[in-house]
């Protein structure tokens, strides 16, 4: 069996590592695996895991919708299809799902077979400030249409699936939930620190709301805050950071976790936040907004705190952890156990193997 994964870009983040693990492990189970992708653009960086993959580049494939570039991206995808002749075309995130499912008949013709179409929602764009209003309505309309061309819709969290069905995207029988498998990072030995340190790691862009993290930092002048990541708001965040906040830019997650006592997430929208899973595997309690699949990762009051999307609630939860080493230790221990059990790489791989074998029948 041959499976071709398509994603617009392998930017720094959990989705790139998710695909990398599939590409590494599936061939061990007689599933030939190929990855086709475009290039990261602007202030983003490509995930280091991409260097471990033999990827097929689709030069015109980008994150933004562009009718001219998208036309060429589809033609380039057809060339890849003719070469690989996949049994399964597995697209990831909106843009690749758009290119890979808009004209399925031409893909079948290029492959000389009836290709099975799988699409994974690693989240959705409906609550993303960048895709609000009219853009959100257009995306919803597209997704409803594309779902009709899809054999299986994979979600990385139960909440993502509920959100899609509420918007009448797909039918319940099309859906399967496969939580991401995440391996613990190799955490360097922590250096002694005098202050409680709170780490924040994400793309420094609107949907992650880094400015809210700065507002919270101002409320805890005796604590140290570390902001890790890059993006279009990096310069703004650097300019507005208070005295107790270091803006690090792109930083190795393991180093950040080593330097932090608590991890903070201020996102407006999430799918299944891999960084928060990695933080918990590192034994760190997490304070995060209740968006997307966050509540499936962070168990409220057990492995951290899940709050409403406002500065006051986040700060209140954070204060509890800052003031109690006992609570930090207990929640950190619980976080590590929960993440190891719920987000097993082996479970993720086996779920994909079962999915592909079922489609092959």
Give the predicted meaning of each segment:
Residues 56, 144-187:
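Donor nucleotide-sugar binding/catalytic pocket of nucleotide-sugar-dependent glycosyltransferases
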Residues 237-251:
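Nucleotide-activated donor-binding/catalytic signature segment of Leloir-type glycosyltransferases, i.e.
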Residues 300-301, 305-312, 320-325:
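Conserved acidic donor-binding segment of nucleotide-sugar-dependent glycosyltransferases
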Residues 268:
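Aromatic "clamp/platform" in nucleotide-sugar-dependent glycosyltransferases that forms part
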Residues 285-288:
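Short hydrophobic beta-strand element within catalytic cores of glycosyltransferases
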Residues 68-75, 116, 126-146:
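Nucleotide-sugar donor phosphate/pyrophosphate-binding loop at the beta->alpha transition
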Residues 16-24, 196, 200-219, 232-235, ...:
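A conserved mid-protein helix/loop that constitutes part of the nucleotide-sugar donor-binding site
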Residues 5-69, 163, 175, 231-233:
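N-terminal strand-loop element at the rim of the active site
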